[in-house]
């Protein structure tokens, strides 16, 4: 009964039926469009754009637009999309995943929805896994779009900023997923709006979508710089702070744990370090180091706040008294304590910006993708990306022979059998593709084939250009190719002359992958577009996946039957057990990716807030009101900490507040206790703000409107960038240590969300305090440049194009862009990075 209901109400069938009707409408226009001249066909683009301007939607134009691309493709490339390709294109336009078997023409399928969505002028991104495929598709398919009057861009790692901006400004941009992610991060580190390269993210079509959104989902893209200041400054600040005396040179409030230099302390600092004004923008880093050294000596107590164990500073949880191993204080405080205790000062975090593919691609207004294998991950695509997987029928029925698994006792027996099978097929001239899970297996089989004197090619996904060439030739008579399962994706294996008669391409799998999807990809290499082919997996009881579900019992059974190492078994029971083991592993992997996303969502929300505000800063002509509001918040906090509601006004430490305000915001003697005595807390805030506004207006009068506006931007950008980078580091440390605090009845994710939110609020307050302090106390230099602000920052800044992406071998894998010290600086100053952004104070 259930089976009948499923057939009647199967949503996939309904979707396919709907797409088929639409495809019939497109096909019905074929003859009319064939009669159009080239110019008339080109003019369709102008006509469609006009219709969109008049209020029609892209959905209204679908049938005609698809018919236009179909005819243009026939004229330009000689390829005429089949009906199933039209259906695949409709699925892509609707923001779904088209599951189309290998060889069904996914690349051509994408041209139709890409053209339709590019008509709005907002830009469409076609995403591939490597630059070779991006270049190839831009070259081959780009001709169709250019014939129809649209512009095509190719975004490569080697391009400079102007070339990248041009590539993104095109109607259609081909790029790799890595480059898109890194460009997004770089755009949110620029100092001028004009330096940005990407437009708002509109629509993306991802080729090999399962590889990018699932296999690489847990890979964070990280832009990192070399530590822009040496650890020497911590040691110097530590030595200086040891010479200071409490009350004379600094004040300490035990309740708020805040330590402040007095005027005398500042004078000593300026003398000790040979500078004129400690609050000058140039000396931001020095000021920060002194403040942290003071805090380390005065506010942080050994064996109370931290302990020293095996040469490491370990934080003590103030609530539980437990040691929080793996956690470090942020903003350089940990390094300051290390200097205080005479330990080796560790380098600070160098992460400048980070995002995962999951969160990058979820920012697009509309997202779609193509692959030959997505159905097994349908739930993940639906839950995380809100995309449905639509299995598109093949143009020709699949006649490939998928044979049952052959299972051997040992790996040695299995590999010998594989080599023997390859040798027999080689003798007949049938091409063979041997798929392996690991590079070591490829090398082992290569050795066995060499011993048998069989010529072959080994592929290990290092050289994309060469890889595609080898894969293309893998269908020729007598070809033997050994490849890791993922190698050569996106390149078809076309059968050579006379190969069909030999049974087509033989695909041999040397073990089952933990994901059924990867096994299906390997099978899909054979039998494209109705071609013949066979697939055969060889397994052994020693394979990792087999060991997972209790191969010992089966081994004992084989021993009882007296089976030797040369005889395989074909058992449905074992094959089913393998599949259920794969399903379990897939489920576990999905759960871990889902959990990662829940943790990553905390940082995503914070990143969106910071990047949005940062853009508003570089986009704004006048930040005065924003800066005044920041100062107001900072003053309210300062006043609040000295005028607690639970104390009587007579108990308020107003002398401490006056010292703080005069030192950090106004000038010595600007306000006195007498000025604020007897006032309510909000009256004190208003009084101080009036004095601050007077100082602000006087400063504006002195320097002029234009210079003051640029000065505000410099100060705000410096504060936002340095505090955000510290915050990324702190969140990373919190994330790594949070599971250690999963005490009874505690949900670590909830703890991470709550603590992460508190840390974000603290960061915002810290930004406001920094802006208030430096806007009021720094002097403006005549040749003020935004780039100079970064020299005083706590970390390095933006990478250059052409930098290496390196993968750090940690779990999860991280794709990192490093900044070379001799690279030209991103800011356009013409200086080397080490003499500009990477300059050490």
Curated annotation (Swiss-Prot):
Q: Which CDD domains match?
A: DEXDc_SecA, SF2_C_secA
Extract the GO molecular function terms from the UniProt entry. ATP binding; metal ion binding; protein-exporting ATPase activity
Q: What class of enzyme is it?
A: translocase
Where exactly are the transmembrane stretches of this chain?
Answer: none
Where, per UniProt, does this protein localize?
Answer: Cell membrane; Cytoplasm
Annotated membrane topology = Peripheral membrane protein
Please name one Pfam family that this protein belongs to.
SecA_SW
Self-association and partners: Monomer and homodimer. Part of the essential Sec protein translocation apparatus which comprises SecA, SecYEG and auxiliary proteins SecDF. Other proteins may also be involved.
Q: What is this protein called?
A: Protein translocase subunit SecA
């Amino acid at each position: 009964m259930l089976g009948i209901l499923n057939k009647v109400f199967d949503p996939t069938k309904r979707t396919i039926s709907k797409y088929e009707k639409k495809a019939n409408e497109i096909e019905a226009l074929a003859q009319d469009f064939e009669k159009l001249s080239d110019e008339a066909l080109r003019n369709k683009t102008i006509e469609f754009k006009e219709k969109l301007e008049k209020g029609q939607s892209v959905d209204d134009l679908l049938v005609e637009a698809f018919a236009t691309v179909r005819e243009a493709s026939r004229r330009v490339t000689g390829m005429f999309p089949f009906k199933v390709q039209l259906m695949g294109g409709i699925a892509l336009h609707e923001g779904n995943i088209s599951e189309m078997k290998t060889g069904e023409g996914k690349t051509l399928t994408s041209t139709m929805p890409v053209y339709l969505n590019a008509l709005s002028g907002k830009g469409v991104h076609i995403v591939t896994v490597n630059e070779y495929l991006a270049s190839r598709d831009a070259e081959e398919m780009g001709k169709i779009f250019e014939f129809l009057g649209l512009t095509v861009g190719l975004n490569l790692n080697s391009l400079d900023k102007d070339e990248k901006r041009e590539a993104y400004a095109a109607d259609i941009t081909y790029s790799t997923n890595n480059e898109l992610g890194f460009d997004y991060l770089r755009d949110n580190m620029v100092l001028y709006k004009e330096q940005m390269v990407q437009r708002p993210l509109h629509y993306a079509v991802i080729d090999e979508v399962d590889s990018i959104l699932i296999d690489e989902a847990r890979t964070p893209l990280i832009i990192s710089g070399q530590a822009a200041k040496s650890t020497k400054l911590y040691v110097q600040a530590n030595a200086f702070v040891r010479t200071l005396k409490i009350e004379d040179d600094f004040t300490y409030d035990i309740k708020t744990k805040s330590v402040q230099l007095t005027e005398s302390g500042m004078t000593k600092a300026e003398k000790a370090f040979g500078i004129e004004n400690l609050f000058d923008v140039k000396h931001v880093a020095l000021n920060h180091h002194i403040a942290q050294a003071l805090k380390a000596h005065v506010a942080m107590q050994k064996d109370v706040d931290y302990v020293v164990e095996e040469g490491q500073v370990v934080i003590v949880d103030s609530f539980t008294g437990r040691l929080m191993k793996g956690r470090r204080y942020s903003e350089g405080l940990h390094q300051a304590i290390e200097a205080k205790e005479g330990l080796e000062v560790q380098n600070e975090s160098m992460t400048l910006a980070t995002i995962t593919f999951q969160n990058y691609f979820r920012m697009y207004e509309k997202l779609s993708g193509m692959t030959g294998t997505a159905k097994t991950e349908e739930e993940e695509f639906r839950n995380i990306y809100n995309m449905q997987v639509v299995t598109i029928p093949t143009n020709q029925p699949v006649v490939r022979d998928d044979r049952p698994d052959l299972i051997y006792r040992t790996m040695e027996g299995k590999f010998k059998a594989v080599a023997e099978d390859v040798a027999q097929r080689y003798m007949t001239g049938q091409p063979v593709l041997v798929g392996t899970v690991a590079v070591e297996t490829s090398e082992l089989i290569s050795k066995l084939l060499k011993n048998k004197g069989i010529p072959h090619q080994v592929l290990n996904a290092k050289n994309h250009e060469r890889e595609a060439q080898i894969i293309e030739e893998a269908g020729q008579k007598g070809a033997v190719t050994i490849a890791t399962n993922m190698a050569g994706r996106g390149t078809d294996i076309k059968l050579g002359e006379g190969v069909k008669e030999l049974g087509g391409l033989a695909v041999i799998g040397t073990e089952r992958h933990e994901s059924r999807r990867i096994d299906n990809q390997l099978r899909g290499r054979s039998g494209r577009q109705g071609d013949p082919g066979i697939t055969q997996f060889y397994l052994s009881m020693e394979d990792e996946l087999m060991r997972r579900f209790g191969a010992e019992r089966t081994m004992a059974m084989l021993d009882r039957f007296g089976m030797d190492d040369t005889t395989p078994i074909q058992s449905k029971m074992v094959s089913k057990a393998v599949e259920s083991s794969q399903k379990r592993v897939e489920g576990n992997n999905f759960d871990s990716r889902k959990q990662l996303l829940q943790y990553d969502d905390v940082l995503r929300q914070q990143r969106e807030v910071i990047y949005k505000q940062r853009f508003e800063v570089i986009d704004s002509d006048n930040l005065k009101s924003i800066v005044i509001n920041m100062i107001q918040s900072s003053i309210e906090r300062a006043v609040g900490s000295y005028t607690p509601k639970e104390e009587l006004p007579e108990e308020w430490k107003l002398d401490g507040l006056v010292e703080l305000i005069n030192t950090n915001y106004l000038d010595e003697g600007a306000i006195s206790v007498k000025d604020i005595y007897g006032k309510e807390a909000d009256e004190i805030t208003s009084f101080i703000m009036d004095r601050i506004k007077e100082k602000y207006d006087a400063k504006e009068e002195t320097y002029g409107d234009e210079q003051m506006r640029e000065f505000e931007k410099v100060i705000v950008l410096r504060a936002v960038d340095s505090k955000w980078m510290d915050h990324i580091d702190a969140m990373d440390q919190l994330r790594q240590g949070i599971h250690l605090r999963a005490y009874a009845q505690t949900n670590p994710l909830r703890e991470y969300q709550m603590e992460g939110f508190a840390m974000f609020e603290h960061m915002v307050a810290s930004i406001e305090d920094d802006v208030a302090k430096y806007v009021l106390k720094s002097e403006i230099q005549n040749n003020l440049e935004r780039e100079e602000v970064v020299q005083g920052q706590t970390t390095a800044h933006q990478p250059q194009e052409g930098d290496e992406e390196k993968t750090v071998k940690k779990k999860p894998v991280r794709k990192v862009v490093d900044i070379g010290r001799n690279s030209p600086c991103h800011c356009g100053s013409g200086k080397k990075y080490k003499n500009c952004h990477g300059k050490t104070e």
